[in-house]
Amino acid sequence: MRGGENRPPARVQSSSEELELRHQSLDAFPGRRLPGRGIQPAAKMSSVGKVTQVPNGKAYQQIFQAEVQLVHSLAATRKRAAERSVTLKSGRIPMMKKVETPEGEVMSPRQQKWMHSLPNDWIMENPVLHREKERAKREKARESENTIAAREVRGLMDTIVPEKISTSTFQRQAEHKRKSYESALASFQEEIAQVGKEMEPLIVDTGGLFLKKLTESDEEMNRLFLKVENDTNLEDYTIQALLELWDKVAGRLLLRKQEIKELDEALHSLEFSRTDKLKSVLKKYAEVIEKTSYLMRPEVYRLINEEAMVMNYALLGNRKALAQLFVNLMESTLQQELDSRHRWQGLVDTWKALKKEALLQSFSEFMASESIHTPPAVTKELEVMLKTQNVLQQRRLKHLCTICDLLPPSYSKTQLTEWHSSLNSLNKELDTYHVDCMMRIRLLYEKTWQECLMHVQNCKKQLLDWKAFTEEEAETLVNQFFFQMVGALQGKVEEDLELLDKSFETLADQTEWQSSHLFKYFQEVVQLWEAHQSELLVQELELEKRMEQHRQKHSLESQVQEAHLDRLLDQLRQQSDKETLAFHLEKVKDYLKNMKSRYECFHTLLTKEVMEYPAIMLKELNSYSSALSQYFFVREIFEQNLAGEVIFKFRQPEAHEKPSQKRVKKLRKKQGSKEDMTRSEESISSGTSTARSVEEVEEENDQEMESFITEEVLGQQKKSPLHAKMDESKEGSIQGLEEMQVEREGSLNPSLNEENVKGQGEKKEESEEEDEKEEEEEEEKLEEEKEEKEAQEEQESLSVGEEEDKEEGLEEIYYEDMESFTISSGNTYFVFVPLEEEHCRKSHSTFSAMFINDTSSAKFIEQVTIPSRLILEIKKQLRAGFFEHLEKWFDQCSLNTRVTVATKINELDSELELHLHLHQPRAQQIEKDIHNVRAAELLLHQEQLDSHCAGVTETLKKKRLMFCQFQEEQNVRSKNFRLKIYDMEHIFLNATRSQKLVTLSNTLHQELLSYVDVTQVSLRSFRQYLEESLGKLRYSNIEFIKHCRLFSEGGNFSPKEINSLCSRLEKEAARIELVESVIMLNMEKLENEYLDQANDVINKFESKFHNLSVDLIFIEKIQRLLTNLQVKIKCQVAKSNSQTNGLNFSLQQLQNKIKTCQESRGEKTTVTTEELLSFVQTWKEKLSQRIQYLNCSLDRVSMTELVFTNTILKDQEEDSDILTSSEALEEEAKLDVVTPESFTQLSRVGKPLIEDPAVDVIRKLLQLPNTKWPTHHCDKDPSQTGRGAWACGSRGSSEAGAGGAVCSPPVLCSCPGPSSPKGFKRHRCQPENSGKKAVPSASATSAGSFTPHPKPNKMERKYRVLGDKPPPAAEDFKGIILTLLWESSENLLTVAEEFYRKEKRPVTRPDCMCDTFDQCAENISKKILEYQSQANKYHNSCLIELRIQIRRFEELLPQVCWLVMENFKEHHWKKFFTSVKEIRGQFEEQQKRLEKRKDKNAQKLHLNLGHPVHFQEMESLHLSEEERQEELDSMIRMNKEKLEECTRRNGQVFITNLATFTEKFLLQLDEVVTIDDVQVARMEPPKQKLSMLIRRKLAGLSLKEESEKPLIERGSRKWPGIKPTEVTIQNKILLQPTSSISTTKTTLGHLAAVEARDAVYLKYLASFEEELKRIQDDCTSQIKEAQRWKDSWKQSLHTIQGLYV
């Protein structure tokens, strides 16, 4: 080892590792302090334990053994001390961790585990043991060596070792130590050499494996490059493939770097393992050499230190070699990476050139594709347009043909307007469709252009996406090639679309003209029909008017006749006897015959007017037929005569029509010659392909039109019978169709030729047309002149015989120029065709159509053109339809006229018959309705007069009978009044109040007055009734006369009848006056008799009663005093109950708040800390008031109890006589008890006063010992406590007070009326005799009650049951009750003394009063003592309930503590979150500002900045961005520091506030009253069954009831403060525990407050850690984001600068 043969590889060791090695080696040899070093051994050994070698022969063996024993004893002592010391299983300090408390539990599982574990349990972590250990270490460190040594010596055993002598022991030991040292040193050298042998193969194997991997990596990279370079399809590669190639190469290079790092780490780990092995060997042999005891410990350390130094030099050399190897390998790897990058860049350049050529070729193919030149969408749209045109054209043509359905008689102006609007809408729809189609085609082409531009942009984007071309190169390539191709194609398409759009506009104008022309044509002919209809209607109205005039004249004459007849009938009705009635009846019958003859003359006149109507209608029909033939240029005029025979008249062309006819003939001849020439030229020269195609299209269109017309004609024939025989007129119409076709071909051929020249011949065509028109006009003039000359010559040369031949020639010419048509009746009509053609030509001369400009668009124009032949055919159908309707209309009108005439004649006959029928029975009706009715009226008048007189007589009899009944009623009322006065005697005797006697006395006079008033009112009312009824009877006579009206007044009486009626009614009025005077005299006599009888009864009754009021006044005073006492006691009970209810309500409200807070955790409706604390303070105030009122606190003595005790002890002997004398009364009271609860049950309405509960009290106070009265008991629960009974009384009093608004205040003490139950029954059974028997019974009772008694004195001791002096003033319940009882007792005795001091007099109410003062005072004392006993019971029950409330509040207090602490924590956390939010908001605003600067810098960065010219601009931009990045870095760092500082500051504030708040809260809880602070109530032990007691006895349990156990151990306590944790120490928010808190009490609230404080503290620390972690994470992400932007910015700058290198 020292020679270096087996030296391990050199390894460099740092100073820190060297110190660590030395320290570990020193720790392996504990003992003394090494000289010259500052290292303190782990344990110290005093000089006593030092082992030294003594020369042989100079010491006894006994001394040596003693020293050895001393050393062993000292070691054992130290071992025991070490065993007794506390050693934690884990070296870490137990931490308080944040553990969530399960819902519904107070402690977490960890805390429960601590609570259930045993003391000093090694399984559980124990902070106390750790604290004790640390304390022991600190105390031990403070002790000096001498002190330790002295303590150790004192702990040695006092043993004696026998004396022995030995001389060879030290030599043998020394030899043994030397051999052991040499063998250990040899083993040490061997193990060092073995370590070197073991490590060498591992290093060699690691290096060989690395070289193998390096070779494989080079071969793999070369293979990847060769694969791409040798591939002929390089252009098929994508940029991703090339990037993947570089990624693979880079991955290999990265893997090589990783392998180099792994090699370095593996070699270093081998060196570290070598070091560890060497350390273990050094430690091991340091102990072994030390155990041999051959060398001193310092020498052993020195030896080991030298060996370690040599090893450290070797290890440092090894580390240096490994570092150099790592640098060399990394340099070679970087060089290889640069070469590979250059090689890969060459491949990318080649790939870019290939891609550019491929992109140009693909775009050329794209532009040359069919989808661009003829887009499928446009082709499809054109096909759809053709189909839609065909559909719309068919609809329009079909609608044009429907005009034939509007012919009369089904014609209406509304239908025609609808037809025209529908046609216009169809035309507009087609025009709109053309516009929309053109728009859609343009949009489709626009999409195509957009597609081309998109393709251009895609190509550009593709170039940029490949990252092989710059943006300028891409722009140049796009502008030079792509945009030019797209622009050329777009211009060509736009020109074609413009031509098609113009053609559609021209077509729309032509269609509009055709539609308006057809509508105007039909409208003109329909106007003839409407004029004819209106004329027919006028003639019909004229007829009606003439007939109405005759009727009005006849009506006036009839009115005059009827007026004269009415006068005759009035005379007939007003006759007074039968003879005059018969004469006037005959006169009326003669006048009726004259009226009948006048009706017959009127009928003859109207019949003549009706028969002239058919001739007028026929004249109007012929006029309509003539107008129709003239409009349609028809020669024949259809007419009829009155017999219905048909007559045809022929008309000649009019003067203004002849020149037009000649002009049309010449024009037709000229057109025929031109057509022949054109056809010959076309046959010679076959024409151009364009003309042929147009002719073919025209022929196809003509064929389609012909087929369509044929279909429509057939359809019209099916619809209407008008076309049944149209086949006959086809020959004439075919010629017209052919002529129109020739004209159309002639007009189309020039336009087709001009189309080939592309519009250059348009001007030439216009000039040619003008020339032709001028030539035609000149030729027409010349021909007219020639014709005139020829005509004159012919006229001169022709003779009279030749005129007939001339007419025949003219007819032949006319037939040649005419067209015929035959209708369904077989009649044939001829039409002047030249005139009609001239009319059409003039209308069409202003329109010229030149709209076909291109062969491609010709099919779209021809598809929607309306053929002229169709218009002409529709006109012919309309003409035939009108003439068909004309013939039928003649027949229909003739028939209608005949029907109308016949109807009118029948109506006139019926009218005459009706008049005669109505006139015939008038004579009989007059005789029956007027003559006979007047006769019956005379008889009825006499009967009514007799009936009225009989009614008056009957009414007078009824009034006499009613007076008799009224007299009997007054007698009964007088009798009832007397009985009522007699019955009031019973009320006087039973009255319980003096005021009631006074009231009864006043009632007598009131009853008298009321009786007199009733009597007078009844007499007055009957007198008034009699006057009114007799007045009505008189008025009935007057009314009867008024109802008898004369004929002049609208009645049916004559003057003679009125005179007889008046004489009869005067006799009846005299009879009424006589009856009224008799009844009035009798009523005055009755009134005087009734008043005298009532006054006599009242005067006799008033003198009977006098002494009842005196006794009642005394009873009322006693009643009033007792009532006041009860009311005052009940007021105190109500006050006590209100305090109890207030405490219960507060507890319930507290429980509800707790429940609400627990259920709404996290919502806005949570209860705050201040609310809960203020609520607890309110409870404390209410509880203190309650305790003060009940005087139940243990820390003060109740003055009331002292007074009670003193009074009872003082008066116990003096009151013995009173108690002895009242034993009989107590026994009787047991049988019939009156409780205070019964006072609340007031006497109900309708029950006797004797049943009032207060009467029982008066009976007990005032009754004699031997009297027994039935009492009224209130229903109550026998188990009801004293407090419950008094509470019932208080509620009763409150209810009585509430009812005071309706009735008078309740009187709680009154006496019964009857003297005995039997008497009470007798009075009820015999009410009439009660007044007579009441006075004798009262006098009999009072006669037996006169007994002599001594004068009363209330100051005697036996009456002073509550003491002579009044109790002191008190505010508690018992003191107040005692004061009330004493004062009431004094007042009652005073009243009784005053009453019984008066002179002797009879007692009128012995059932309610006592005879002597002694009896009355004894009953008063007994009742006062009963009240006092009940008050004590009620006070005891209040104490029981108060303790229950205090206990319940203490059970709710822990929940309040937890909620308060949670709210405290949430409040602080919200404040902290607000602060953090403000800091982050400021940071975000600054960050947005810097982001805007970043965006501006990024926008400024473009490719041109890389040019050397823009170097300064580039540099300033770079500096600006670096400044912004530095500002962002500093801002992120400052934001992190601010957030962390804010978090720590808030955490420190929270802990401080939490400690302060807990201390204040615990001190406030000291003030909470517990059940231990309140007196214990006296409770009688409940009675238990004997079987239950036997079982408890057998079970060994106590037979006594267990006393109430406290909720927790009471007493003062010291609560620990908040302890610091690792988190608080690291963040320096809490380094030392807070001060402990001392309280004078220990309640559940104290425990809950401390537990809640600790839980909240842990939760806050957890949130604190999460917030710090969040701040750190946010800062890290922000730094990473900033760093990514920095790298991207640098890369962009490098790329831009590299473009111009």
Swiss-Prot record:
Spell out the protein name for this chain: Coiled-coil domain-containing protein 180
Keywords from the named record: Coiled coil
- Specify the domain of life of the species encoding this protein: Eukaryota
Pfam families tied to this protein = DUF4455 (PF14643), DUF4456 (PF14644)
Query: Could you tell me where the Acidic residues compositional bias lies?
Result: 696-705, 767-808
What spans are recorded as compositionally biased (Polar residues)? 683-692
List all Basic and acidic residues biased stretches: 672-682, 755-766
Residues covered by region (Disordered) = 1-35, 657-808, 1272-1291, 1319-1354
Any one GO cellular component localisation term in the record: extracellular exosome
Q: Does the keyword Mitochondrion apply?
A: no
Coiled coil location: 171-198, 757-804
Q: Which InterPro entries match?
A: DUF4455, DUF4456
Which spans does this entry mark as compositional bias, Basic residues? 661-671
User: Carries keyword Coiled coil?
Assistant: yes
